[in-house]
């Protein structure tokens, strides 16, 4: 699948927002266990009103028109999915957002899914920041188990790990909104 590009002005503004609000320098241990001299707290962009608009503008430029839902593993996917779905609605596009719990609930509405994902949905799987892609691919597995089809893997930021190769191996289009070199 060929994905459309993000408008240059939107991409530049999103990168500038991330650099100003989300990038930190220092000595950090990443979720992957790797050490890094920089860290992206991308929720500082994904949860900021201006950041949401920039993120959603970029995302809606690359999410296939036939996608019907957006979501991923909580907590990383939540602000991305909810923000993109809300902005999509203001533009006349319907994308249902959902989240996948890390563990199934044993009370109320049980299971790992929270939100209106349906069998047959064509899904954009998202995450705020990714290095190895384990959370994204856990979400892919759950979405498939629920009878929906992942059509795009779209992290807000790709730090440059193994996610692109894993997506290619799984046969799913991959388009981060921003990469570390950006």
Give the label of every model feature segment.
Residues 2-17, 140-182:
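PRPP-dependent phosphoribosyltransferase catalytic core
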Residues 80-124, 131-137:
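Short, glycine/charge-rich flexible loops or terminal/linker lids adjacent to PRPP-binding catalytic cores
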């Amino acid at each position: 699948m060929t994905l459309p590009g993000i408008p240059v002005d939107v991409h530049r503004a999103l990168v500038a927002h991330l650099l100003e609000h989300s990038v930190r320098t220092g000595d950090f241990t990443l979720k992957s266990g790797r050490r890094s001299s920089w860290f992206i707290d991308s929720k500082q962009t994904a949860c900021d009103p201006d950041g949401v608009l920039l993120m959603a503008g970029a995302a809606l430029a690359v999410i296939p028109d036939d996608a019907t839902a957006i979501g991923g593993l909580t907590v990383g996917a939540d602000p991305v999915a909810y923000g993109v779905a809300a902005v999509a609605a203001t533009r006349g596009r319907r994308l249902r957002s959902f989240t996948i719990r890390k563990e199934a609930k044993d009370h109320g509405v049980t299971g790992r899914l929270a939100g209106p994902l349906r069998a047959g949905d064509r899904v954009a799987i998202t995450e705020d920041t990714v290095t190895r892609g384990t959370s994204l691919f856990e979400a892919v597995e759950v979405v498939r188990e629920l009878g929906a089809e992942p059509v795009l893997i779209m992290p807000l930021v790709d730090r440059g790990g193994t996610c692109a190769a894993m997506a290619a191996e799984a046969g799913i289009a991959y388009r981060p909104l921003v990469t570390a070199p950006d």
